[in-house]
């Protein structure tokens, strides 16, 4: 029987490669060849970075949910960088921190553009299959996610585009290369539609607001080209958008309830206390449930949400009134405190209204740094910030869970805000871990974590370059009308259109994270939010943090390890470590310390007792430095001979003390003065041409006595 082989054209009749340029580098989208069972897919090639992007949607809406079930997954495959995973099974496990943060960065601009009433599960997957360090896989994934969703039949009000922005030598650079990112004072990611900004995420070295806004505008111009590229593909192969089945409340019933209970809801909402508000709303909902017994719990939750949302927004837009009575630019009552935990190396508590965060700072050695097992070239992370959000912080009665995406994202934001002000490894050779425990939450806990971290770091004696504070700005829009308000609390965040978080110093911005629930922001709104956050940040720095702790403590906590560092020749590393690690283990045991020797010759020594660390440093110096004539050492007697004793002044370095130089008086027998294993002081008197070292205990004793008498006279 003959076998007929189909041609490539017959196998993939819709296959096509679309090409454009992105920030000066080739960008390609291959479609119609792979992943034929997903709603839409594309293989994105940016330089030599390759990301497979897919979108799928369930055919039926999910029942019993009051939200749009969107799931965005960014996957890093280590084969993309030619690496084998370091896990026991040698396969990728759960998403790492970088993958989770990238998933959030893509989710945030995509989500607001889906219909809010849709309840079908939608999953967007971006898989990094090849990594070119000069071409960002995050940006390739974001653009690919936008492309496949726009081409698919899934209802979505896109497309969007995204770029990264750097600031190298004062010049704005789009999608910076690997080397440019290392030199850049700005790591900004912007996502936008053709006419509005939908997402901003940034870390920066104290960049001013004007420069930041200029960078955003520059990014938007490049994004418009990306969107034009996507629109051309959609025009050619886009599928008709489907009609989705809405699952919601009977609006006739809602309007009847609104007319009857609106004043009751307003009275319950008019308070600055979250607990009082929740308690006042409960009997109203009970009355509604009795009057309308056919309503489900989900219906009641939706009614409460809609009523609260309308009240909060109408008060702000029509009356300029906030639920807690504050002015639009007024910050909630603030308090700061340091030194709360006596055994922690540093601690600080920051309170803003009913939001309260306690942050601790722990100092460790270089070996305590976090190992990174992802596609990044950074093998270890020296500064770590963890954010914990226990159930009791919002009054919930349930057991704590492991950190989720939200906790990881908030921790990363606070971490990003503090990194630019940390001292260099050379000036402060410590691993630093801050942990923010949210004690009470009513909005802006991530910004309270930034303030708490500043307090804890300065309390620990970490010589940060400048204090950092964080604050958020909210937004309410209606058509062309809009209003921003400073320091939003939980109910304003929940029912508002934006949470614009900015961290920074007096000099400039160090971190930004912008979340929105609408189709985007204009430049005017962004500029207004920047200015409000700048004024709020300066107020917190000058009026709250500075009076409590104006500068880092001059001394570390007595419980913190004392760290010292030296640089040794790389060819001497083997001598410090010794065969099988014998030498370094002996130093650690004798000096009660930890030692980390790095490939470039940097040696870090940490010990609780400062004198232990100094002894270890001295021992290392004696190993790597040639003995100096006239120098005094403390050595160990290793062998006894009739004519003298051999003394080891450093591992592998031994000299002879002749019997005539063993003591200040005449010595008949070597055994009368020293024994094997004794620790004695010796002075180097001579080193011959063959490198043999001659030592004198007598001269060392005389020199030390003379030094002692000289100090007494002074």
Question: What are the language-model segments listed below?
Answer:
Residues 2-245:
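Long, basic N-terminal domains or extensions that often function
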Residues 559-564, 568-714:
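Single-stranded RNA-binding regions, centering on S1/OB-family and related RNA-binding modules
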Residues 116-122, 157-159, 226-244, 275-276, ...:
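Flexible, glycine/charged-enriched surface loops at secondary-structure junctions
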Residues 2-58, 242-377, 561-575, 583, ...:
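Extended amphipathic alpha-helical scaffolds
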Residues 108-116, 151, 340, 365, ...:
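Conserved helix-loop functional segments at active or binding sites
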Residues 2, 66-75, 141-144, 295-300, ...:
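Conserved glycine-bearing catalytic or ligand-binding loops at nucleotide- and phosphate-handling centers
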């Amino acid at each position: 029987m003959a076998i007929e082989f189909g041609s490539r054209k017959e196998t993939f009749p819709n296959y096509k490669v679309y090409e454009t340029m992105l920030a000066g580098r080739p960008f390609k989208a291959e479609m119609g060849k792979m992943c034929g069972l997903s709603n839409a897919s594309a293989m994105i090639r940016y330089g030599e970075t390759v990301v497979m992007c897919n979108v799928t949607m369930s055919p039926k809406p999910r029942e019993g949910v009051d939200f749009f079930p969107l799931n965005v997954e960014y996957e890093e495959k280590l084969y993309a960088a030619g690496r084998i995973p370091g896990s026991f099974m040698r396969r990728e496990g759960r998403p790492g921190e970088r993958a989770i943060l990238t998933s959030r960065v893509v989710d945030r601009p995509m989500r607001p553009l889906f219909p809010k009433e849709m309840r079908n599960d939608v999953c967007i997957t971006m898989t990094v299959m090849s990594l070119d360090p000069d071409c960002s896989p995050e940006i390739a994934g974001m653009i690919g996610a936008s492309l496949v969703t726009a081409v698919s039949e899934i209802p979505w009000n896109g497309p969007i585009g995204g770029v990264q922005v750097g600031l190298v030598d004062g010049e704005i650079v789009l999608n910076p290369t690997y080397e440019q990112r290392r030199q850049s004072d700005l790591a900004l990611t912007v996502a936008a539609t053709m006419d509005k900004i939908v997402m901003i995420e940034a870390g920066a070295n104290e960049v001013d607001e004007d420069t930041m806004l200029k960078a955003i505008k520059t990014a938007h111009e490049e994004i418009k080209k990306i969107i034009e590229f996507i629109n051309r593909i959609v025009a050619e192969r886009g599928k008709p958008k489907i009609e989705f089945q809405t699952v919601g409340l009977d609006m006739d019933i809602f309007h009847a309830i609104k007319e009857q209970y609106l004043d009751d809801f307003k009275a319950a909402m008019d308070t600055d206390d979250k607990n009082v508000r929740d308690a006042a709303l409960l009997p109203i909902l009970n009355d509604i449930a009795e009057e309308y017994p056919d309503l489900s719990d989900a219906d009641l939750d939706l009614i409460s949400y809609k009523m609260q949302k309308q009240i909060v927004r109408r008060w702000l837009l029509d009356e300029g009134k906030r639920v807690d009575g504050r002015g639009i630019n007024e910050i909630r009552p603030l308090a700061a405190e340091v030194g709360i935990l006596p055994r922690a190396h540093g601690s600080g508590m920051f309170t803003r209204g009913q939001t309260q965060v306690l942050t601790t700072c722990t100092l460790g050695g270089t070996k305590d740094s976090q190992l990174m097992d992802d596609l990044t070239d950074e093998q270890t992370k020296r500064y770590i910030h963890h954010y914990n959000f226990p159930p009791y912080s919002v009054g919930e009665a349930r057991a704590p869970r492991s950190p989720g995406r939200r906790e990881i994202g908030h921790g990363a934001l606070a971490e990003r805000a503090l990194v630019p002000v940390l001292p260099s490894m050379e000036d402060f050779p410590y691993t630093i871990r801050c942990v923010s425990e949210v004690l009470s939450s009513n909005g802006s806990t991530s910004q309270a974590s930034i303030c708490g971290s500043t307090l804890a770091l300065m309390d620990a004696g970490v010589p940060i370059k400048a204090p950092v504070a964080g604050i958020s700005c909210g937004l309410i829009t209606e058509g062309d009308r809009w209003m921003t308000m400073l320091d939003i609390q939980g109910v304003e965040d929940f029912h508002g259109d934006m949470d614009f978080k900015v961290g920074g110093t007096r000099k400039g911005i160090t971190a930004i994270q912008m979340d929105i629930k609408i189709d985007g922001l204009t430049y005017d709104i962004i500029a207004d939010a920047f200015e409000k956050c700048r004024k709020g940040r300066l107020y917190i720095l000058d009026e709250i943090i500075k009076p409590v702790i104006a500068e880092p403590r001059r001394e570390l906590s007595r419980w913190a390890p004392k760290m010292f560092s030296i640089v040794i020749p790389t060819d001497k590393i083997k001598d410090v470590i010794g065969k099988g690690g014998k030498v370094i283990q002996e130093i650690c045991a004798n000096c009660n310390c930890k030692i980390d020797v790095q490939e470039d010759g940097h040696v870090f020594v940490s010990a609780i007792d400062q004198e232990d660390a100094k002894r270890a440093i001295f021992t290392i110096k004696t190993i790597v430095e040639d003995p100096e004539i006239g120098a005094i050492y403390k050595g160990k007697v290793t062998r006894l001979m009739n004519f003298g004793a051999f003394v080891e002044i450093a591992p592998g370095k031994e000299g002879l003390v002749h019997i005539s130089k063993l003591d200040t008086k005449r010595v008949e027998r070597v055994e009368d003065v020293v024994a094997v294993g004794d620790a004695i002081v010796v002075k180097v008197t001579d080193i011959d041409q063959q490198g043999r070292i001659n030592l004198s205990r007598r001269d060392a004793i005389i020199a030390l006595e003379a030094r002692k008498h000289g100090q007494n006279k002074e």
